[in-house]
């Protein structure tokens, strides 16, 4: 387990991540096209990181993404026990949350052009000041969701 570390400008996109990260900060790191499996992040923060076309298959608990590029990121197979996610001022164009269970997720000031939330459980999530142009919510549980 990696704890209480800060990673700056690390290129992870060709690495094989297989670890648990607790209370870590990632600044301007590149995770593009990475399949993030067998890796859990808890109480971590990602700032200005690149997750273009990354695929999340591990667990994310109490994780914040700020000013990240997440174009085409895939959360479809994210661990079902992931929770406490916050996305702020991030680009999530074409991101897929199909069938993901991410209740109480917070999206603030995010650009989400043509994002896919089909059949996802996004109950009690917040979409505050987000650009939701052409986003698909077919079959999505949006009970008590806030679209302020």
Identify the residue ranges that each predicted region occupies.
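Tandem repeat scaffolds
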Residues: 1-148
């Amino acid at each position: 387990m990696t704890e209480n570390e800060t990673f700056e400008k690390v290129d992870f996109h060709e690495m094989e991540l297989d670890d648990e990260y607790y209370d870590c900060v990632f600044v301007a790191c590149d995770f593009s096209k990475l399949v993030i499996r067998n890796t859990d992040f808890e109480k971590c923060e990602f700032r200005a990181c690149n997750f273009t076309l990354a695929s999340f298959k591990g667990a994310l608990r109490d994780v914040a993404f700020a000013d990240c590029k997440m174009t085409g990121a895939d959360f479809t197979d994210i661990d079902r026990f992931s929770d406490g996610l916050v996305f702020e001022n991030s680009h999530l164009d074409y991101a897929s949350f199909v069938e993901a269970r991410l209740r109480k997720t917070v999206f603030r000031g995010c650009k989400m052009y043509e994002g896919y939330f089909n059949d996802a459980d996004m109950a009690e999530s917040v979409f505050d000041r987000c650009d939701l142009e052409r986003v698909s919510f077919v079959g999505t549980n949006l009970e008590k969701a806030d679209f302020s």
